[in-house]
């Protein structure tokens, strides 16, 4: 979805229950999702040339959920949202809701985009250097998720990770969690640079280039896995 650079990580299983998500435009809430049905819909959106959370079929969402604009003055908190995310208020601003979602009792908090959303209680927002997210950022000791998965970089400060871990949370680091994707991108970019020169020279057609790229999938995958095994 728009702004969710590494959200494809949530296409790895049809058993996941995606209860909330957000990007720079919208907040997605599905308090009690059907894992299989919502997986199919996420996959449909992922395969569109361009997509936003507003393209999501809201008819399959559970009661009390919805897709809300981050520019709204306030958002009504349904009974289902209150129960799922342990929220007491009847209304919240979008920023207040995002702050509550980050602190919600869930199994997995997945960072799929850009921004630093978790710091340590000993750090100031100025220390973080991400002013756009100052109002919604939380401290590591406020997280109630069991695990943080970092598809994107710099989602937590290092001190924030330490504080989360000291309070019983599980996390690696961003450079470990997303190492496979970064390594895969490195291979992809270098191969495409090489092949583009061959195509421009007239020694290969675009169709032949695309067929060759597809045929290299398993080989590149094995190289990426090998590099990551050595790294971690």
State each model region's role:
Residues 1-232:
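Non-transmembrane, aqueous-exposed alpha-helical and coiled segments at domain scale
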